[in-house]
UniProtKB/Swiss-Prot annotation:
GO cellular component terms, A-Z: cytosol
Biological role stated in the UniProt entry: Necessary for normal cell division and for the maintenance of normal septation.
Native species: Rhizobium leguminosarum bv. trifolii (strain WSM2304)
Cofactor: Mg(2+)
Gene3D superfamilies: P-loop containing nucleotide triphosphate hydrolases (3.40.50.300)
Binding site residues for Mg(2+): 44, 66
Name of the protein this chain belongs to: Probable GTP-binding protein EngB
HAMAP family: GTPase_EngB
Residues engaged in binding GTP: 37-44, 64-68, 91-94, 158-161, 192-194
GO MF term (any one): metal ion binding
GO biological process assignments: division septum assembly
UniProt-listed PANTHER family: ENGB-TYPE G DOMAIN-CONTAINING PROTEIN (PTHR11649:SF13), MSS1/TRME-RELATED GTP-BINDING PROTEIN (PTHR11649)
NCBIfam families found in the cross-reference section: GTPase_YsxC
SUPFAM superfamilies tied to this protein: P-loop containing nucleoside triphosphate hydrolases (SSF52540)
Amino acid sequence: MPETEKPLFGHPWIFIRGVPSLNFLPPEGPLEVAFAGRSNVGKSSLINALVGQKGLARTSNTPGRTQELNYFVPDGYSGESGDMPPMAIVDMPGYGYAQAPKEQVDKWTKLVFDYLRGRATLKRVYVLIDSRHGIKKNDDDVLDLLDKAAVSYQIVLTKTDKIKAPAVPKLLAETAEKIRKRPAAYPGVLSTSSEKGDGLDDLRQAIGETVGVARWK
């Protein structure tokens, strides 16, 4: 793997744009990893913990707050040819919010599917699953969509500090078995706690390996 001048997660990240429709997508440049999950799965909190910046991705107690594809990149790059950031993180709209109007849900669904299907620089989607609830029907629907689009994805359990520690290995094994036959699923399942910091280095390393950057911290 090539070395990069700066570690992926050892310096500040910045928000570059929100994408309400494909017309607003940035030009394809650095490799991208995306984060998907049900509303209030802790997606924004995990991104903030991952980069060590509390206010980067906006968190909210209101489900369905993220309605766009939100792009984040490491700071310190001009974005011009020869000075591109090594990667981008894409925070995807949360799904499964029962109170969202159907028109809004349809809009999110189209945006997400079009992005997944047509983004050549997208290397992997990290699908976040609340460790207290496991894989639910809406999650299965998203995994079906990713399998259909042939987009590589990896399951990341969140909020493991909310369950008893001895339950985590069992949950990891059960989750791995549930996705074993899915064609686009990466076999390793990760567990994380944004609150305690557990598993964050494992996720950072996984992302570094995915985008081909050896120096991730």
